Swiss-Prot record:
The record marks W57, L58 as: Cleavage. The virion-associated Nef proteins are cleaved by the viral protease to release the soluble C-terminal core protein. Nef is probably cleaved concomitantly with viral structural proteins on maturation of virus particles. Myristoylated. Monomer; cytosolic form. Homodimer; membrane bound form. Interacts with Nef associated p21-activated kinase (PAK2); this interaction activates PAK2. Associates with the Nef-MHC-I-AP1 complex; this complex is required for MHC-I internalization. Interacts (via C-terminus) with host PI3-kinase. Interacts with host PACS1; this interaction seems to be weak. Interacts with host PACS2. Interacts with host LCK and MAPK3; these interactions inhibit the kinase activity of the latter. Interacts with host ATP6V1H; this interaction may play a role in CD4 endocytosis. Keywords: AIDS, Apoptosis, Early protein, Host cell membrane, Host Golgi apparatus, Host membrane, Host-virus interaction, Inhibition of host adaptive immune response by virus, Inhibition of host autophagy by virus, Inhibition of host MHC class I molecule presentation by virus, Inhibition of host MHC class II molecule presentation by virus, Lipoprotein, Membrane, Myristate, Phosphoprotein, Secreted, SH3-binding, Viral immunoevasion, Virion, Virulence. Disulfide bonds: none annotated. This is Protein Nef. It is found in: Host cell membrane; Virion; Secreted; Host Golgi apparatus membrane. A motif (Diacidic) lies at residues 174-175.
Length: 206
């Protein structure tokens, strides 16, 4: 008895059911919108551009010319522990992030690229406050931000070919502590959630 919905062989349902069964939890340290995605499979009305900084930032990117479509080409999902570890190792293997001077603009470009190609909502790449080493809040992300030695900053700014807009020339203007930071890979961060130990207050709602 029953119509088309009584059959488990409805086109694609077994695949969807299996995907739901295997859905990984969001990694510790992701933002509120990613928690929504984990819990409800979508971003709810409690996280809008008016109430959530990551949602507002993403909406603003849609109005800017960023070089690639902002709408993801894959389903929207929260960053998971496994995905953060895999992404860290992928970027280490491909090169380009290790030792790169951090700026908010560069982080935005990385977040948008990952959002566009992988569908991970861009509220996962957050770090502990400074001064000193900034550890990732998202467990599994193996890149920390490390202050660059002042003499290396000075050395990088010598000569006439220095770009005044290069992040190293901005002398930490992006950073509340005025430190020049660089991304540094640390495989131990896949096993040791340093941010949670240093700042348990950030994880009360996790």
């Amino acid at each position: 008895m029953g119509g088309k919905w009584s059959k488990s062989s409805v086109v694609g349902w077994p695949t969807v059911r299996e995907r739901m069964r295997r859905a990984e939890p969001a990694a510790d340290g992701v933002g509120a919108a990613s928690r929504d995605l984990e819990k409800h499979g979508a971003i709810t009305s409690s996280n809008t551009a008016a109430t959530n900084a990551a949602c507002a930032w993403l909406e603003a990117q849609e109005e800017e010319e960023v070089g690639f479509p902002v709408t993801p080409q894959v389903p929207l999902r929260p960053m998971t522990y496994k995905a953060a570890v895999d992404l860290s190792h992928f970027l280490k293997e491909k090169g380009g992030l290790e030792g790169l001077i951090h700026s908010q603009r560069r982080q935005d470009i990385l977040d948008l690229w990952i959002y566009h190609t992988q569908g991970y909502f861009p509220d996962w790449q957050n770090y502990t406050p400074g001064p000193g080493v900034r550890y990732p809040l998202t467990f599994g992300w193996c890149y920390k931000l490390v202050p660059v030695e002042p003499d290396k900053v000075e050395e990088a700014n010598k000569g006439e070919n220095t770009s005044l807009l290069h992040p190293v020339s901005l002398h930490g203007m992006d950073d509340p502590e005025r430190e020049v930071l660089e991304w540094r890979f640390d495989s131990r961060l896949a096993f040791h959630h340093v941010a949670r130990e240093l700042h348990p207050e950030y994880f009360k709602n996790c």
